[in-house]
Design a protein with these regions (language model features):
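Intrinsic low-complexity/IDR segments
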Residues: 1-27, 31, 36-41, 46-164
Length: 164
């Protein structure tokens, strides 16, 4: 596998250019690879060996303490959440989506009732003041969509995701 070629084609794919293709680095041996400056957004890094790799600065999720963030729900709704200091949290190498083991619901668009929103596929309702816990939590930075409660650091990102 020619990593440089794969990443160049991935960049073309991100830009919607001809001959571009999404990078699939599943199971790739990236030991000691210098990935600084590489745009890995949307790349499949599942089971990739990243031991000793020089990675881009990817930590956007605060490592300690509680903090406020935004959760995209169904029908374009976005709620403000708090990630408690006791929650496990991470974000992936390939995007700006973060995830936590639990969150507290703070505010949402609904002013009339305590239900701020829902995720019908997951059967989860978000009520003002409620603590919501993930069924399980996966801290693997190589995977963007995996177990945990997903959220974004900025409202703008959450609104984009909710309305895509």
């Amino acid at each position: 596998m020619n990593i440089k070629r794969v990443l160049n084609e991935h960049l073309k794919w991100l830009r919607s250019e001809e001959k571009g293709s999404r990078a699939c680095l599943r199971g790739a041996n990236l030991r000691r690879a210098d990935l600084r400056g590489a745009c890995l957004r949307g790349a499949n890094l599942h089971e990739a060996d990243l031991h000793g790799a020089y990675l881009p600065s990817y930590k956007i999720c605060p490592e300690k303490g509680s903090f406020r963030a935004f959760k995209a729900l169904s029908e374009g709704l976005v709620i403000e959440i708090e990630v408690p200091s006791s929650a496990k949290r991470t974000n992936s190498l390939i995007g700006r989506k973060c995830r936590a083991s639990k969150i507290k619901c703070i505010t949402g668009p609904s002013k009339k009732n305590k239900c701020l929103g829902w995720l019908p596929k997951a059967g989860v309702y978000y009520y003002k003041g409620a603590i919501v816990k993930a069924d399980s939590f996966d801290d693997d930075i190589r995977v963007e969509c995996v177990h945990g409660i997903h959220f974004f650091i900025t409202r703008e990102e959450a609104e984009w995701w909710a309305n895509r």
